[in-house]
């Protein structure tokens, strides 16, 4: 879900059978995310799990934890076709962000008894990257490029320069934004393109 049309989208998703929601934004440390979480909590209580993000430091994690997020996504600008760092000038190395947020999660658990899982989102290109992210403290992973290569991904298989490829685009790209998947909130005229369209080598 995003933090713009949640009042319409969330009830429709719940009615369709969803029991876990995730707010998708490149900037999770924002009042818009808190408002979205508050809406879900006021309407559905704890019967629906809601994750939030993305953040890259302890302050961002604590903000979302205290706002009531059930899990937190970590990573800004690390995706293989993400250009948030170039267009907005924000972001952080994925390993550094993950280690700091994992430490904040553990400290929060010691203080409150509430364990909030964290998801490493972005920059996981090769198999060993998964192992590294888990070793650095991630509870689970979010991956796009890795799975976009396969038949099961919904995009078209094409031949480019004699090789099979699959279409792939960033969640912050204009193409994805047309589907209202990736939104910060606020005025629609204040928007940045934060991803690009590309291809990945077909893997079967």
For the regions a protein language model found, what residue spans apply to each?
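Short hydrophobic alpha-helical runs that function as membrane-insertion/retention elements
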Residues: 21-22, 73, 142-143
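Short secondary-structure boundary segments
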Residues: 25, 76, 145
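Catalytic cores of alpha/beta
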Residues: 6-13, 50, 56-74, 124-139
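Active-site-adjacent beta->alpha loops and helix N-cap segments on the catalytic face
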Residues: 3-9, 25-50, 55-65, 79-102, ...
């Amino acid at each position: 879900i995003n933090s713009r049309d949640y009042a319409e989208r969330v009830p429709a998703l719940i009615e369709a059978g969803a029991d876990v929601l995730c707010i998708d934004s490149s900037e999770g440390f924002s009042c818009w995310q808190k408002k979205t979480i508050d809406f879900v909590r006021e309407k559905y209580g704890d019967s629906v799990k809601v994750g939030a993000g993305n953040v890259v430091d302890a302050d961002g994690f604590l903000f979302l934890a205290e706002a009531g997020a059930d899990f937190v996504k970590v990573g800004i600008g690390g995706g293989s076709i993400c250009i948030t760092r170039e267009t907005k000038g924000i972001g952080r190395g994925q390993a550094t962000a993950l280690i700091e947020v994992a430490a904040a999660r553990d400290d929060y658990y010691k203080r409150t008894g509430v364990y909030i899982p964290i998801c490493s989102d972005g920059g996981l290109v090769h198999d060993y990257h998964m192992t590294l992210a888990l070793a650095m403290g991630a509870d689970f992973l979010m991956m796009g490029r890795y799975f976009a290569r396969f038949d099961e991904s919904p995009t078209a298989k094409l031949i480019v320069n004699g090789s099979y490829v699959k279409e792939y685009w960033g969640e912050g790209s204009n193409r994805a934004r047309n589907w209202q998947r990736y939104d910060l909130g606020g005025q629609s005229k204040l928007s940045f393109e934060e991803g690009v369209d590309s291809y990945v080598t077909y893997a079967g």
